[in-house]
């Protein structure tokens, strides 16, 4: 029960980050960019045809996908699932929609089913780094911390300065009891973005570190 409570607090924080930056959902995962990364396979299909009907379908699909991301950021998981499903119905090869639906499904209480969708998203588009982040979060929700850590690491292979993937790894090491690595990774995250200090100081992952001299120095307690 305690682990589940801590995980929910972790997820709520990351949804706030998503709402502010779009990380892992509708934005490029590069921490210093905010341009949209929501182009789906349906958009590409629509651009290759002059048929008005196909163009209209593409617009509607984009609307569903955008609505799904907005609902997810707002914590409206059921709506996010419904909108992503509508997007998938219009294009069964829309990997981004599968990724969003998978994350929403996991947050809605079915991490195993959510993982099926995020894996499908990877099969459809193995180069979608945003889905790597979602995979990491879904594995974390399922308690598979080593798998989660591997997917955060895959994000960092493409984007070494992705603050919240670095921080995600720090929290995993903290939860696993590896204090040295937890603080090493926390220090890396803080060097990328100093706002991590206040986050780490307040999150339960690092609550037991509050008397740790190195931790106090890192976060300024």
Name what the model sees in each region:
Residues 100, 134, 168, 202-203:
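Canonical tetratricopeptide repeat
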Residues 57-96, 100-103, 107:
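Alpha-helical segment of the N-proximal tetratricopeptide repeat
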Residues 90, 124, 158, 192-193:
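Structural marker of alpha-solenoid helical repeat scaffolds
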Residues 20-22:
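C-terminal motif of bacterial Sec signal peptides marking the signal peptidase cleavage site
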Residues 27-36, 45-53, 191-221:
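Terminal, low-structured helical/coil segments at or just beyond the last alpha-helical repeat
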Residues 74-83, 107-120, 142-154, 177-185, ...:
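Structural signature of tandem alpha-helical TPR/SEL1-like repeats
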């Amino acid at each position: 029960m305690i682990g589940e409570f801590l995980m929910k607090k972790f997820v709520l924080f990351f949804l706030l980050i998503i709402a502010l930056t779009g990380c892992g959902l509708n934005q490029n995962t590069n921490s210093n960019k905010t341009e949209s990364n929501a182009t789906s396979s349906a958009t590409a299909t629509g651009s290759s045809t002059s048929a008005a009907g196909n163009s209209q379908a593409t617009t509607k699909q984009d609307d569903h996908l955008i609505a799904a991301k907005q609902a997810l950021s707002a914590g409206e998981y059921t709506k996010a699932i419904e909108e992503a499903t509508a997007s998938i119905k219009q294009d069964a090869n829309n990997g981004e929609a599968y990724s969003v639906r998978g994350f929403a499904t996991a947050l809605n209480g079915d991490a195993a089913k959510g993982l099926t969708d995020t894996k499908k998203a990877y099969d459809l588009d193995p180069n979608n780094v945003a889905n790597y982040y979602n995979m990491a979060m879904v594995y974390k929700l399922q308690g598979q911390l080593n798998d989660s850590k591997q997917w955060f690491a895959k994000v960092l292979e493409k984007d070494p300065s992705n603050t919240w993937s670095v921080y995600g790894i720090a929290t995993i090491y903290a939860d696993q009891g590896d204090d040295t690595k937890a603080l090493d990774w926390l220090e890396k995250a803080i060097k990328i973005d100093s706002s991590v200090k206040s986050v780490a100081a307040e999150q339960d992952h690092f609550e037991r570190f509050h008397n740790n001299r190195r931790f106090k120095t890192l976060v300024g307690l």
